[in-house]
Amino acid sequence: PSTEKETPSTNPQTPETPNDGTVKVGQVIKAEGQYGVFTYKVTGKGTVEVKSITAKGKAKKSVKIFDKIKASGKTWKVTSVAANALKGNKKMESLTIGKNVRKIGKNAFANCRKLKKVTIKSKKINTIGKNAFKNINKKATVKVPKAQKKKYAKLLNKAKLSKKVKIK
């Protein structure tokens, strides 16, 4: 892999990484852009999972999990968030989850005590892992697509989201 830093993408929705040639399932991709360093794991043909995010600047407070990224000359859909991906993040206050995410791993956002605003754009989430949202701010609001409100409320409650958190 190249040790050169890539230039931030012109489109803030798709951070890029250097072209490293062929990318295989299981391989880890690091993308550094204007929002920080994102680490992804290739999960299938054209799909990746967020492993971790080291945000910088204003992005430390407002974290975005992108719909897709560009890496190795290819566009990848971000379809899942790994277990423990942002567990214990002390600065994150808001989180936006992209429209292609289908799975959120266990403890993904657990103990993010300052997290007050979660926006889920995806209409495809089928799995939210155990304790994924445990111990986020008790005054938090989770905004979900209207058609998925009932389904997501059930999934979020199973994931130990506090009963005090509002689901809109």
List each language-model region with its residue ranges.
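A structural signal for leucine-rich repeat
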Residues: 131-135, 154-159
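Structural signature of tandem-repeat unit edges
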Residues: 42-45, 58-80, 90-103, 113-127, ...
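Acidic, Ser/Thr
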Residues: 53-55, 69, 84-86
